[in-house]
């Protein structure tokens, strides 16, 4: 192998610096590969090897087959090495819990069938959207997926806190019993905070896939519409947020299905479509 290994045609790709460490640094005879030119290029992505079989991310080296691509089914927003721990993928469980609870509440917000009292969602929010999603998020952290763990644990906490609002034992609604205006403003700020948080996560998905990005972008808009609906006391805006929430629920189910369906168990697979900004990635 020459001192300058082959790189892709991407103009951002240059030769990687020396000092990489990987379990794949030695060939079958135990001979180390040639060192790469030493210049600073941390944070860039490179290809190397006779057939471009290696990926260099920062100062780490991986086989292409060892890397996870951006994929909604695993809640990985970008290239990531395979986790050290060997657990099943918890993302579909967390996404399913989020999707079903969002679907139920959003149908209530949209006033489907004339329903105005959302208390039926409390049980779902406590145990499926809350507890189960929180457990899935903790498992994501164990699998070294910071984004997935942050998202699932946070939205699990959202559903638990939302359920607490409608549980009389907490006394939250009772405190606003004589002041509906304060209740609407308080719920508006509550939902606005979640909108801001979700917009932050959306920025972290802009190099992933279309359905992955849409999940968080539309969810942020849903929170924003619901927040505005409470601030302005406009039922029409709240209903619009409910309709958009139903769309978000189906996108979450799609991403969950993408993480469950494989060639071994299904004839119908969910194909990831990368966003335009990721078409230059070297895979």
From Swiss-Prot:
Q: Pfam families of this UniProt entry?
A: Gpr1_Fun34_YaaH
Keyword Ribosomal protein attached:
no
In the induction comment, the record states:
During meiosis and by external ammonia.
Q: What is its main location?
A: membrane
What residue spans carry the region label Disordered? 1-41
Report a single Gene Ontology molecular function: acetate transmembrane transporter activity
Q: How does it sit in the membrane?
A: Multi-pass membrane protein
InterPro entries, per the entry: AceTr (IPR051633), Gpr1/Fun34/SatP-like (IPR000791), GPR1_FUN34_YAAH (IPR047622)
This protein's record includes keyword Transport = yes
Cytoplasmic domain ranges by topology: 1-89, 142-151, 207-208, 262-283
Q: Which GO terms describe its cellular component?
A: mitochondrion; plasma membrane; vacuolar membrane
Q: Which residues lie on this side of the membrane: Extracellular?
A: 111-120, 173-185, 230-240
Q: Which residues cross the membrane?
A: 90-110, 121-141, 152-172, 186-206, 209-229, 241-261
Q: Which BP terms does GO give this entry?
A: acetate transport; ammonium transmembrane transport; meiotic cell cycle; monoatomic ion transport; nitrogen utilization; transmembrane transport
Location comes to: Cell membrane; Vacuole membrane
Alphabetic keyword roster? Ammonia transport, Cell membrane, Ion transport, Meiosis, Membrane, Transmembrane, Transmembrane helix, Transport, Vacuole
Described by its record, this protein's role is as follows: Transporter protein required for ammonia export and acetate uptake and resistance. Necessary for up-regulation and down-regulation of meiotic plaque (MP) component levels in a dependency on external acetate. Has a role in ascus formation.
NCBIfam families, sorted? AceTr_1 (NF038013)
Q: Which family does it belong to?
A: Belongs to the acetate uptake transporter (AceTr) (TC 2.A.96) family.
| Protein name per its UniProtKB record | Accumulation of dyads protein 2
Q: Which organism is it from?
A: Saccharomyces cerevisiae (strain ATCC 204508 / S288c) (Baker's yeast)
């Amino acid at each position: 192998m020459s001192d300058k290994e082959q790189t892709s045609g991407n103009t951002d790709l240059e030769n990687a610096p020396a000092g990489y460490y990987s379990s794949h640094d030695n060939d079958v005879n135990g001979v180390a590969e040639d060192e790469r030119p030493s210049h600073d290029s941390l944070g860039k992505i490179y290809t190397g090897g006779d057939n471009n079989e290696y990926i260099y991310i920062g100062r780490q080296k991986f086989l292409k087959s060892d890397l996870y691509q951006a994929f909604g089914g695993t809640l990985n927003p970008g290239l990531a090495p395979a986790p050290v721990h060997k657990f099943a993928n918890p993302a579909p469980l967390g996404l399913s819990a989020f999707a079903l609870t969002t679907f139920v509440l959003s149908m209530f917000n949209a006033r489907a069938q004339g329903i105005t009292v959302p208390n039926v969602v409390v049980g779902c929010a406590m145990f499926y959207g809350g507890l189960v999603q929180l457990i899935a998020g903790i498992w994501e952290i164990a699998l070294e997926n910071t984004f997935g763990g942050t998202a699932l644990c946070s939205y699990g906490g959202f559903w638990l806190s939302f359920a607490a609002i409608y549980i009389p034992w907490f006394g939250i609604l009772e405190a606003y019993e004589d002041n509906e205006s304060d209740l609407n403003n308080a719920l508006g700020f509550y939902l606005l905070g979640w909108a801001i948080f979700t917009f932050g996560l959306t920025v972290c998905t802009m190099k992933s896939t279309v359905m992955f990005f849409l999940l968080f972008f539309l969810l942020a808009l849903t929170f924003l519409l619901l927040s505005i609906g409470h601030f302005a006391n406009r039922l029409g805006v709240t209903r619009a947020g409910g309709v958009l929430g139903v769309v978000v629920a189906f996108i979450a189910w799609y991403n969950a299905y993408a993480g469950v369906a494989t060639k071994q168990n299904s004839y119908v697979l969910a194909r990831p479509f990368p966003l335009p900004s990721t078409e230059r990635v070297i895979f």
